[in-house]
């Protein structure tokens, strides 16, 4: 055990005397040694919303079996909808407290939210940069009923982390009557589908051992995006902590079915981790300050969040030349995930796909040159090219359509080989005029 758990309960009894009365936000000293109840957590998250409305929104994903709210703290710079370059903010999803007796997992979710909220209020440039470019969605306590009863299961005696609709089976202990038979898990999945379908990181927090585990749990096979997970592993080992175990959950923990991690990756297409923060369970407090005890884990979370931009394929066109019956495309992948089935589309003025290429792949942090058959491509006024690809290799990964700036497109004449910029409306007019003057036949329609 990484903390002195035997003394933890003693200090709780001596220092706090009893659980904090739910009438005010928890004092820092009590918060450092006494784990959250549903009541004290509710007070804390509501105080955040009241005190920091510019960066905190509080919503409920639904209610537990006993009617407790599943609070989600949404954290971002809400004064701006997008990033400064106009692109959408990245999204991160975090949950804690699937197992009510795994309190340090819940506390890590709380500390992660607290770091960015308080950092914003204290003008910390790291927190400010993240919140200007990222939305954090954090369900700190998923199983509030189990938390207050200090029980692993919910009040139906179901293990919520065996109840997701991904390789669910009755062979797992206490997996429920069927996938999503419990309100806590169905609410969590519904929140993912409503708010964070395009998230590029999902971390679910637990205790039981010490590991950062990626998919899969149901099979020993490596995930499709093993390159991404192995890059993250190597980067953390080199720059943060070389001893933190990071591997697939099936081998690193034990085989499991119906978990939120495998659902997040296999159904939602997120890069997912289970963060097992400690082997402690059932204790209600800690002798060591919680922020010190989870300092390394918080540093890992900060790393994962700060670099979320890289946790997908990020295709960037270096050049696009169209002439004759081919498009010569040069594209770089700035992300740490590969994409296996990208295509180039040509969109007409009405927004319809007029032409698309065959598939090509671009490996993580790599470069690809492709010669694409364009014999059926005719350019039209108002048309443009776009890249169509999946953000990761896993089948469930989100598809994206990213327009290519016309300044990157060159049109090659059949006879001279000259390269001209792709036509804007003005360029179309100029090109037609020049064509009339010079009596040149062009290979494409203006």
How would you label these PLM feature ranges?
Residues 26-34, 168-170, 174-418:
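C-terminal accessory segments enriched in acidic
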Residues 53-59, 134, 242, 348-351:
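Short glycine-aromatic motifs
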Residues 24-70:
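Short glycine- and acidic-rich boundary segments immediately preceding or forming the N-terminal edge
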Residues 86-98, 102-226, 230, 234, ...:
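Active-site/substrate-binding loop(s) of hydrolase catalytic cores
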Residues 47-48, 78-81, 115, 190-194, ...:
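A generic secondary-structure signal
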Residues 72-87, 97:
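Short beta-strand-to-loop junctions in surface cap/lid or active-site-entrance loops
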Residues 1-25, 408-446:
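Secretory targeting signatures
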Residues 83-86, 151-153, 263-269:
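Short glycine/proline-enriched loop/turn "hinge" motifs that connect secondary-structure elements
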């Amino acid at each position: 055990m990484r903390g002195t758990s035997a003394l933890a309960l003693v200090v709780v009894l001596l220092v706090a005397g009893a659980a904090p009365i739910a009438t005010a936000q928890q004092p820092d000293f009590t918060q450092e040694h006494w784990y959250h109840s549903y009541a004290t957590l509710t007070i804390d998250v509501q105080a955040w919303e009241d005190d920091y409305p510019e960066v905190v929104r509080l919503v409920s994903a639904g209610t537990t079996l006993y009617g407790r709210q599943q609070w989600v703290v949404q954290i971002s710079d809400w004064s701006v909808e997008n990033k400064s370059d106009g692109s959408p903010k990245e999204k991160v999803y975090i949950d804690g407290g699937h197992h009510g007796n795994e309190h340090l997992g819940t506390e890590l979710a709380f500390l992660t939210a607290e770091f960015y909220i308080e950092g914003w209020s204290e003008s910390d440039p790291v927190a400010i940069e993240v919140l200007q470019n990222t939305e954090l969605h954090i369900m700190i306590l998923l199983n509030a009923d189990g938390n207050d009863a200090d029980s692993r299961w919910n009040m139906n005696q179901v293990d919520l982390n065996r109840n997701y609709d991904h390789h669910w089976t009755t062979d797992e202990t206490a997996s429920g009557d069927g996938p999503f038979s419990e309100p806590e898990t169905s609410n969590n999945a519904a929140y993912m589908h409503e708010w964070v379908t395009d998230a590029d990181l999902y971390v679910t927090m637990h205790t039981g051992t010490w590991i950062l585990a990626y998919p899969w749990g149901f099979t020993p096979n490596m995930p499709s995006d093993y390159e991404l997970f192995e890059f993250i592993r190597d980067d953390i080992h080199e720059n943060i902590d070389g001893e933190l175990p990071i591997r697939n959950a099936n081998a690193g923990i034990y085989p499991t079915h119906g978990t939120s991690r495998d659902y997040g990756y296999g159904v939602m297409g997120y890069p997912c981790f289970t963060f097992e923060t400690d082997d402690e369970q059932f204790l209600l407090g800690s002798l060591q300050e919680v922020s010190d005890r989870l300092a390394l884990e918080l540093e890992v979370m900060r790393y994962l969040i700060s670099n979320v931009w890289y946790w997908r394929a990020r295709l960037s066109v270096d050049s696009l030349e169209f002439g004759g019956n081919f498009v010569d495309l040069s594209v770089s992948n700035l992300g740490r995930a590969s994409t296996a089935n990208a295509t180039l589309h040509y969109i007409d003025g009405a927004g319809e796909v007029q032409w698309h290429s065959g598939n090509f792949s671009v490996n993580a942090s790599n470069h690809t040159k492709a010669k694409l058959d364009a014999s059926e491509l005719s350019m039209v006024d108002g048309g443009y090219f776009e890249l169509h690809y999946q953000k990761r290799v896993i089948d469930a990964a989100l598809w994206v359509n990213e327009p290519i700036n016309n300044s990157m497109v060159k049109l090659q004449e059949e006879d001279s080989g000259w390269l001209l910029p792709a036509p804007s409306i003005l360029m179309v007019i100029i090109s037609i005029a020049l064509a009339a003057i010079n009596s040149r036949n062009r290979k494409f329609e203006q």
